[in-house]
Amino acid sequence: MSAVKIESPRGQTWSKVEEIRLFKWMMLFKPAGIHKHFHMVCLLERLNKPDQYPIKLLQSDKGSSDKVFSGEDVWEQLSRYYNLEKADEVENQPYPEFYNDDGPTETTNKKTEGDAQLDNDDDSDNDVDNCDELKRNIIPLQNRLQQETEFELSWEDYGELMLEHARDHEVEDIKQEETASADDKAKLKGAESQDTQVEQESEEPREREKDIDEKDTEQNNVQAKQEMATTPPVSVGESVSELANEPVDEPVDAHKKPRTRRSTRLTRSQKRGIDDESENKEDQPHGGNTDEKEDVEHDTEGRSGSEKESTADAADTTATKQVTFADESEGAAKESANSPTGKAEENETESSQQPRPKKQKVAAAEEVPEDLADVDSPARRTRRKSITKPTTRLSSRLRSRK
């Protein structure tokens, strides 16, 4: 609690700052009229507490905060500038009638229902009439104070101030527009950056998947090339057995013709050709059989080289034919050597000096390697007949003569 300040006696001196504070608060709380005592209480509270109710002053003077003012000090100071009795009369006067340019207001001419009842009553007093007059006069004044009015300032006195005020408003408007445009641009950039980020995030997994697929395909191609390079050459018999047991999965090209799997079984025409060749070999001498073996081995070696270049299906068919031809020729040679009729037939064949059908067949096969790939083709059949059938006819005629 702060120490209680001693009230000053009458005739207290007032500084400039204290007088300014007095008139400042007197504008809000007039110590005159009916409510002058209530207004004086509020005015003394603000004068004695400058820290709680400060006032901005042009000069740097500060009043002493040790002073305590009373109501008598304030009345004495105000009596130097105003006539307090006249001030009370003016403050207590009723509001005068308010007239517009066109005449008295509507409120002065019209009467409310309550006013009509008061006028009609014979027992109405003068006090009631005075109250009605006060109401009629106060209402238009309140309306007048609440209305907005236009006014003009003289250009000579306030022209420069008005120009500066207008320029300041223009500058502020321009700044506000610039800031608004900058904010809009920043928002647009932020939205665009967010969209680009979302697109990049969505594209990244796709690119990763593409890269992974490309890497997998490259690795598969490299592995396939390495396997092709590292696989050793396989003999004809092994390749035939492997191809017969295991199906080969080859990549299908759109430009190449679709391959059809060839069967390894012998057709009737092939079986007839084999029987005819075996009969011809039985007619030949024993000495020529070894030459035929050598020729067959030589022919098989030549055929194996050409068969490697041809397709896998052609290799299957040709290998089986060569093996069967060699086996049957060896069996026929042994039988002809043991039988007595075979020796006679060998002598006849030596005298006749017939051409070797096997060599002709091998030469024809070497000249036309494409027929090996397609055993059942009509061209292959016609050539086989042209090579083998004449020899078979000669052998059958010789047998008939014997």
From Swiss-Prot:
Indicate where this protein resides in the cell.
Nucleus
Q: What are the Polar residues biased-composition ranges? A: 219-233
Q: Record's Gene Ontology CC terms?
A: NuA4 histone acetyltransferase complex; nucleus
What is this protein's name? Chromatin modification-related protein EAF7
Q: Where are the compositionally biased (Acidic residues) regions?
A: 116-128
Keywords, alphabetical = Chromatin regulator, DNA damage, DNA repair, Nucleus, Transcription, Transcription regulation
Q: How does it assemble?
A: Component of the NuA4 histone acetyltransferase complex.
Q: What gene name does this entry carry?
A: EAF7
Q: What does this protein do?
A: Component of the NuA4 histone acetyltransferase complex which is involved in transcriptional activation of selected genes principally by acetylation of nucleosomal histone H4 and H2A. The NuA4 complex is also involved in DNA repair.
Per the record, the similarity remark reads:
Belongs to the EAF7 family.
| Listed Basic and acidic residues bias regions | 172-192, 203-213, 281-311
GO biological process, any: chromatin organization
The residue ranges flagged as biased composition, category Basic residues, are: 256-271
Chain spans, region Disordered: 92-128, 172-402
